[in-house]
């Protein structure tokens, strides 16, 4: 009976008029009213409160500076048309100017940063062939200049399927260099660790698996010779190019490598003579590099000699002309031009991003001077798209029609046993 009376009192209270409601109900209504975000003055009358709240329109949120900038910014049509209202493209000078941005910082410490032009951007490597080569390199404990020097063409070279694109640059004698050039990202150490005695065999094994045209940058002539011999024994048809250092001016070591059975002897002068002291290691000179290329040609006249130069250090046209004349006088057959790209902030800054048109101009000039082949472009590197098919045809003509590129294969007895054992 008590429960029934309680329920009846609740029903009576809910249906009673406002003036008969208890003071406690008015207080509850008032507290609920204050809990809302309405800016109107709260009323003690529940009916008045509900009617006023239902008719209240919420205030519009205050606009912000960011929203104003966003609304005043470019529309989707501006992005499609390039922001100039039409489909006209920018010339290289205008595009280059837009790539320069100012990095914020404290007063007096702001820096101007130049972003990479569009013609220097390459895809991220992710092909099946790329992964296969990388897996083999790790399994055989081999190193490549492609990775150590952060080459932008690694996706194209390792991921290619045809002979001209499938190129890997094996780096002999470990992944560390004893010199410290200001443009190179390869690790440097005054006294690297001992040589891996299995490296020549592993290199030959890797090349026989891949069937690539390979370059072998290294600083040890004896290690070079043994590696070339083993490669030619396992795969005589592979076009072998050795990119060597200057052997500290020891031309006997240059001759040893030149006679080991390789097809192309490459040694890079890197830049013009005037900038060499500022760009390369202090132990390297332009004249010494010329002597290396000349010695290789004397040791084996049918050998193709090759060098590479980077543009963008601040070289002048007169300096480039002078460098090409000296290279041609040294009987160099092939020259390549590429854009210098700064590996890290610790290395030399880029003075200029040379346009593709200018690279093409220097290609034509070099060909007119009598070079057999010239590869010139922003992404060209010493071993990238350097005319393997063209060079192979030249070698066939020099050795006689019908001979394969590996016809002149050296044997172990051609190199002194005591030299190979060192």
Curated annotation (Swiss-Prot):
It catalyses: [[Fe-S] cluster scaffold protein carrying a second [4Fe-4S](2+) cluster] + N(6)-octanoyl-L-lysyl-[protein] + 2 oxidized [2Fe-2S]-[ferredoxin] + 2 S-adenosyl-L-methionine + 4 H(+) = [[Fe-S] cluster scaffold protein] + N(6)-[(R)-dihydrolipoyl]-L-lysyl-[protein] + 4 Fe(3+) + 2 hydrogen sulfide + 2 5'-deoxyadenosine + 2 L-methionine + 2 reduced [2Fe-2S]-[ferredoxin]. Residues 37-48 have a biased composition (Polar residues). Pfam families: LIAS_N (PF16881), Radical_SAM (PF04055). The keyword Iron applies. Residues 37-70 are annotated as: Disordered. [4Fe-4S] cluster 2 binds at residues 177, 181, 184. Its EC number is 2.8.1.8. Binds 2 [4Fe-4S] clusters per subunit. One cluster is coordinated with 3 cysteines and an exchangeable S-adenosyl-L-methionine. Its cofactor is [4Fe-4S] cluster. Residues 160-372 form the Radical SAM core domain. GO terms for cellular component: mitochondrion. It is found in: Mitochondrion. Its main location: mitochondrion. Residues 1-34 form a transit peptide. Pathway: Protein modification; protein lipoylation via endogenous pathway; protein N(6)-(lipoyl)lysine from octanoyl-[acyl-carrier-protein]: step 2/2. [4Fe-4S] cluster 1 binds at residues 146, 151, 157, 383. Keywords: 4Fe-4S, Iron, Iron-sulfur, Metal-binding, Mitochondrion, S-adenosyl-L-methionine, Transferase, Transit peptide. GO terms for molecular function: 4 iron, 4 sulfur cluster binding; lipoate synthase activity; metal ion binding. InterPro entries: Aldolase_TIM, Elp3/MiaA/NifB-like_rSAM, LIAS_N, Lipoyl_synth, rSAM. NCBIfam families: lipA, PRK05481.1, PRK12928.1. Belongs to the radical SAM superfamily. Lipoyl synthase family. This is Lipoyl synthase, mitochondrial. It comes from Talaromyces stipitatus (strain ATCC 10500 / CBS 375.48 / QM 6759 / NRRL 1006) (Penicillium stipitatum).
């Amino acid at each position: 009976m008590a429960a029934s009376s309680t329920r009846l009192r609740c029903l009576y209270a809910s249906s009673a008029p406002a003036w008969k409601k208890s003071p406690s109900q008015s207080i509850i209504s008032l507290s609920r009213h204050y809990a809302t975000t309405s800016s109107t003055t709260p009323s003690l009358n529940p009916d008045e409160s509900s009617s006023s709240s239902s008719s209240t329109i919420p205030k519009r949120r205050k606009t912000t500076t960011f929203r104003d900038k966003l609304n005043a910014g470019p529309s989707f049509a501006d992005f499609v048309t390039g922001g100039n209202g039409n489909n006209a493209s920018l010339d290289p000078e205008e595009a280059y100017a837009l790539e320069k941005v100012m990095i914020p910082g404290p007063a007096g410490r702001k820096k101007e940063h130049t972003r990479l032009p569009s013609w220097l951007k390459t895809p991220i490597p992710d092909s099946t062939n790329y992964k296969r080569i990388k897996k083999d390199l790790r399994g055989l404990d081999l190193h490549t200049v492609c990775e150590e020097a952060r080459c932008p063409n690694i996706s194209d070279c390792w991921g290619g399927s045809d002979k001209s694109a499938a190129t890997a640059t094996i780096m002999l004698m470990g992944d560390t260099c004893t010199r410290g050039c200001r443009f190179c990202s390869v690790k440097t150490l005054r006294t690297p660790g001992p040589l891996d005695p299995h490296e020549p065999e592993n290199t030959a094994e890797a090349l026989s698996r891949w069937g690539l045209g390979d370059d072998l940058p290294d600083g040890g002539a004896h290690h070079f010779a043994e590696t070339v011999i083993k490669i030619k024994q396992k795969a005589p048809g592979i076009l072998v190019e050795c990119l060597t250092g200057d052997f500290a001016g020891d031309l006997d070591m240059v001759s040893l490598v030149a006679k080991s059975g390789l097809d192309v002897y490459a040694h890079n002068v890197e830049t013009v003579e005037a900038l060499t002291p500022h760009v390369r290691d202090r132990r390297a000179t332009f004249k010494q590099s010329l002597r290396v290329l000349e010695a290789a040609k004397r040791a084996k006249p049918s050998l193709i000699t090759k060098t590479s130069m980077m543009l963008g250090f601040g070289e002048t046209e007169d300096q480039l002309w002078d460098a090409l004349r000296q290279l041609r006088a040294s009987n160099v057959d092939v020259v390549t031009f590429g854009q210098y790209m700064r590996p890290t902030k610790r290395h030399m800054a880029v003075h200029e991003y040379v346009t593709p048109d200018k690279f093409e101009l220097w290609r034509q000039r070099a060909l007119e001077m009598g070079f057999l082949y010239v590869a010139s472009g922003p992404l060209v590197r010493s071993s990238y798209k350097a005319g393997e098919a063209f060079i192979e045809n030249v070698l066939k003509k020099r050795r006689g029609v019908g001979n394969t590129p590996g016809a002149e294969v050296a044997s172990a007895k051609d190199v002194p046993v005591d030299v190979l054992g060192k």
